[in-house]
Amino acid sequence: MSRKYFGTDGIRGRVGEYPITPDFMLKLGWAAGMAFRKQGHCRVLVGKDTRISGYMFESALEAGLSAAGADVMLLGPMPTPAIAYLTRTFHAEAGIVISASHNPHDDNGIKFFSGQGTKLPDEVELMIEELLDQPMTVIESGKLGKVSRINDAAGRYIEFCKSSVPSSTSFEGLKLVVDCAHGATYKVAPSVFRELGADVTVLHAQPDGLNINEGCGSTHIESLQAAVLVGHADLGIAFDGDGDRVLMVDHTGAIVDGDELLFIIARDLQEHGKLQGGVVGTLMSNLGLELALKDLDIPFVRAKVGDRYVMAELLEREWLVGGENSGHVVCCNHTTTGDAIIAALQVLMALKRRGETLAQARQALRKCPQVLINVRFGASKVDPLEHPAVKEASAKVTDALAGRGRVLLRKSGTEPLVRVMVEGEDESQVRAHAEALAKLVSEVCV
């Protein structure tokens, strides 16, 4: 069954444009509350990132949930994975996150977690969509949901993050620069690393509701690179606005992406006999990751793009580690979703156990040149991925790469974009192919 509202990562869009409006959020809160309380009374946790519209949508969701008879526990600004963790530990029926992740402040969105802290099952999302098309009713006054605030939410999550590192491990002597993107990690991330002994310089941890992800964080890593070099830090850590993505910068200023972080974590687990199976990447994972894992006899499979699909593949195979090159890294031995702080801690622990710098650790993975071009397709009625000319050109590029590279064309699940990716051994050839395909996609979208 097709979805009317939910994309690959919940509901997302521009604030003030349907469905990212207060009236829709009121109805969404009610529909979610009705779906969650099918089995009787229920409790729902609600958290958000730091964008200004989060306060407005928090109030609307709270009212809708209460009207459906669901109790609401407000977390305030918290990383998305923290909301998943707290939903599980509070034995709530569901968790709701108000966030547009790495997008600018004038976007916002909603995503849900099940009571187990995982992405909501498809059937529950479809049930919510069905209820959204029904008239809203209010439960009798004596059964209205109550609202409370969890005042120690940040402290609970900080202790959880620290518990993912053995008590015998200290990061004393490690000099870090941490970029919080003026987002949801701004309070908890610096505390976690400092309490584990690291010397931490913090960037972009003064959210004002409008500056989330603005020229900072994992999508704008230049200022972190500069700070690492100027401060002679051992490495830098960049989070996105809601704290489910992480990228790093080594002491030379080089960017270390999700594929490389995933490799470092998987290798460390294998060396300590804790890997359990293999590694899940995505269609966008660099071919170099697959080859480096193969050298270690670590199985590797590709899921569709999106951390929910990585998680689904991990659960089906009962494996522990997966992720995306964008910086979503899932460590199922600790979390039920991508958690940027947890992933960063696992990398730091791996470096300490091997006695390596980040620059040294990443050398074992030789990335193949990969060019990604985003093409905006607007309101065009033409599906560029099904256009005969695009299909023919894609097939020709695949033939030209002669089994030593890949071509991937896909639509973004969160934005009106077609992502054109070409990967191979020769960077100039790869770039030429990618630019030609992107130009063709742009032309057929007009």
Curated annotation (Swiss-Prot):
Stated family: Belongs to the phosphohexose mutase family.
Any Gene Ontology biological process: UDP-N-acetylglucosamine biosynthetic process
UniProt: Mg(2+) binding residues: S101, D240, D242, D244
Cofactor stoichiometry and binding remark: Binds 1 Mg(2+) ion per subunit.
Keyword presence, Membrane: no
UniProt cross-references to Gene3D superfamilies, sorted A to Z: Alpha-D-Glucose-1,6-Bisphosphate, subunit A, domain 3, Alpha-D-phosphohexomutase, C-terminal domain
Keywords in alphabetical order: Isomerase, Magnesium, Metal-binding, Phosphoprotein
Reaction equation(s) it catalyzes: alpha-D-glucosamine 1-phosphate = D-glucosamine 6-phosphate
PROSITE patterns the record matches: PGM_PMM
Residues carrying Phosphoserine: S101
Active site as annotated: S101
Keyword Metal-binding (UniProt): yes
Signal peptide limits: none
Any single Gene Ontology cellular-component annotation: cytosol
Cofactor field: Mg(2+)
CDD domains named in the record: GlmM
Enzyme nomenclature, EC number: 5.4.2.10
InterPro entries linked: A-D-PHexomutase_a/b/a-I (IPR005844), A-D-PHexomutase_a/b/a-I/II/III (IPR016055), A-D-PHexomutase_a/b/a-II (IPR005845), A-D-PHexomutase_a/b/a-III (IPR005846), A-D-PHexomutase_C (IPR005843), A-D-PHexomutase_C_sf (IPR036900), A-D-PHexomutase_CS (IPR016066), Alpha-D-phosphohexomutase_SF (IPR005841)
Role of this protein: Catalyzes the conversion of glucosamine-6-phosphate to glucosamine-1-phosphate.
Protein name: Phosphoglucosamine mutase
Top-level enzyme category: isomerase
UniProt superkingdom: Bacteria
Entry comment on modification after translation: Activated by phosphorylation.
Molecular-function GO term, any one: phosphoglucosamine mutase activity
Originating species: Pseudomonas putida (strain ATCC 700007 / DSM 6899 / JCM 31910 / BCRC 17059 / LMG 24140 / F1)
